[in-house]
Amino acid sequence: MSFYVDEALAASGEVVELAVGTGRIAIPTALAGVHVIGVDSSAGMLAVCAERAREAGVAERLDLRVGDLRRPPVDERVPLVTCPFRSYLHLQDDGERLEALRAARELLRPGGRLVFDVFTPSREDIEETHGRWIEREPGIDERADWDLEAPTLTLSVRGPQGASTMTLWWVAPERWHSLLPEAGFEVLECYGWFDRRPFAGGEDSVWIARRK
């Protein structure tokens, strides 16, 4: 969380957060004094975000809009666009990835930055979790079903509030290194975690790219 807040403060301007969800990052960012335009495809999650922002006293610093990663309803041009929580993994193929990356580029001022995080699973993680229900926290179980051909992760969660399922599509870091320049970005950094350690081939990667 602090990683994205630090990036927002360094940008010195309004920030667009794609897939803002319930505001887990947007609200701390607003508390730090930054104005956030938050976009999400779920009106329900935006309603929760708005209520949390009111409770935190930062509703005036959040501008929440319903929209898609590939077509965000934003006319403003900003110094920073973020897409946290591996949200680009909801995109199913390179066509959708390029469309979303180019859309993010259009929101940026010249030299502005796109910051996002994704993952690529290790074979060990796949073997340890595939097809098994695992208790992630008391009363909440999670099951991962991996398809290496697709390649996809179908993640099922069950708990006291009910059950849900979502599918994520991942690609290797090398593919992001190719897609970003194709979409009009220069890759500035690829970290291995939010503490800014160098990427060394692990599962997680955190990207900073600049609009050309």
Task: Describe these PLM feature segments.
Residues M1-S12:
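Conserved alpha-helix/loop element of class I SAM-dependent methyltransferases that forms part
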Residues L98-P110:
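A short glycine-rich, Lys/Arg-flanked "PGG" loop and its adjoining helix->strand segment in the class I
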Residues R24:
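Conserved SAM/SAH-binding loop-helix junction
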Residues R175-K212:
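C-terminal lobe and adjacent flexible extensions of AdoMet/dcAdoMet transferase-like proteins
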Residues V115-S178:
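SAM-dependent methyltransferase
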Residues I27-R71:
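Class I SAM-dependent methyltransferase SAM/SAH-binding core
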Residues P73-L80:
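A short acidic, Gly/Pro-enriched loop at the edge of an enzyme's catalytic core
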Residues S12-G21:
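Conserved class I S-adenosyl-L-methionine
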